[in-house]
Amino acid sequence: MSIITDVLAREVLDSRGNPTVEVELYTEDGGFGRALVPSGASTGEHEAVELRDGDKDRFGGKGVLKAVGHVNNEIAKAVIGHDVTEQRLIDQTMIDLDGTPNKGKFGANAILGVSLAAARAAADEVGLPLYQYLGGPNAHVLPTPMMNVLNGGAHSTNTVDFQEFMIMPVGAKSVREAVRMGSETFHALQALLKSKGDITAVGDEGGFAPNLKDNEEAFELLVEAIKKAGYKPGDDIALAFDVAASEMYDAESKTYTTKWSNPDKKYTTEEWTDMIDGYINKYPIVSVEDPIDENDWEGWQTFTKKMGDKVQIVGDDLFVTNTDYLKKGIDMGVANSILIKLNQIGTLTETFEAIEMAKEAGYTAVVSHRSGETEDTTIADLVVATNAGQIKTGSMSRTDRIAKYNQLMRIEDQLGAQSLYKGRKSFYNVKAID
């Protein structure tokens, strides 16, 4: 038994230069844990509350001194004296103390910082790597990465409608090889853009946002880059994309629109599904995220019924890492995968519960970063601890993204012959892929 003796939070900066919460936690036997909390730009309507100060004279209102204050006062008083290894009890203590359904009193950014710092301190206390402390001796599966190399939608100034275009090294034999394949394809894509006279500046997640006209051109460019890097599209490297459909849905008319490429064009849910199906039939696509609006549950049913056997369908804004929404989706036969974002729900315990529920229902789980990241590498350890099998952590640039890939390679080296990279077999619940 090792008792928590001190908890300290401070305001630091994330990868966008915006304030975020950092927490340090200490135990009586010398255990130490530090965690930094990420932040999303496009957030789901039902996510846990990220508490900001609202003081326009500091960071344009984005300061987090209120959240920091809650950690250093109410939360610290509540968790000091607890056994640092009692993760569920620590998390539940904070949830009860907050007393709101969405962590609106203290902020998920305050609560999550303490939750993660406690786990790190406990791992330090017992002398184990974080992934092994959290996952035990069976933590051994290295994830197949989703690498966001091209951006559109709200993440860019071009006229591409879908928000993220990703490559997945499904044919790699190890995470180290997957990272190399991704890096080589990223640089091949950069060379192609330069040859076309297009911009090669990168966005928040390290991907390019060139002046492309539509989704079709983005998919074609990725296929060309994969070939240029010396790989076979589909066999070696497959494609994935995030539609971010809520950005293009009109609830009143129940229609979708190609908001950026052709805003006058309207689609019913069936027509929208057929449009996406056309891309999936034409290109080596294995995964699609948020293809339907987060509140259009009937639309999700329609999409899943048609597409569920041929592609991974990931719910992000739909599920917001929340077991209540995930259970509803499972009961309704909606999606077949969940995106896992720690700060959407706000504690490590609740994150584990969402992953467990997904697996029990035959859904895959994709552990994900946020657009506002830090040097914190917890998600790399989490994805191995849970044997989730897939990770979404940005492109092959920007240190805040690369830090996670580097940590995965370290973990793979530590595991040695015990490690397993599943690649294409990560999509175990999709008949047309596995």
Curated annotation (Swiss-Prot):
The keyword Secreted applies. The active site is at E205 (proton donor), K341 (proton acceptor). (2R)-2-phosphoglycerate binds at Q163, K341, R370, S371, K392. It comes from the Bacteria. Binds a second Mg(2+) ion via substrate during catalysis. It catalyses: (2R)-2-phosphoglycerate = phosphoenolpyruvate + H2O. It is found in: Cytoplasm; Secreted; Cell surface. Mg(2+) binds at D242, E289, D316. Its cofactor is Mg(2+). One of its GO terms (biological process) is glycolytic process. Keywords: Cytoplasm, Glycolysis, Lyase, Magnesium, Metal-binding, Secreted. Its EC number is 4.2.1.11. GO terms for cellular component: cell surface; extracellular region; phosphopyruvate hydratase complex. GO terms for molecular function: magnesium ion binding; phosphopyruvate hydratase activity. Catalyzes the reversible conversion of 2-phosphoglycerate (2-PG) into phosphoenolpyruvate (PEP). It is essential for the degradation of carbohydrates via glycolysis. Belongs to the enolase family. This is Enolase.
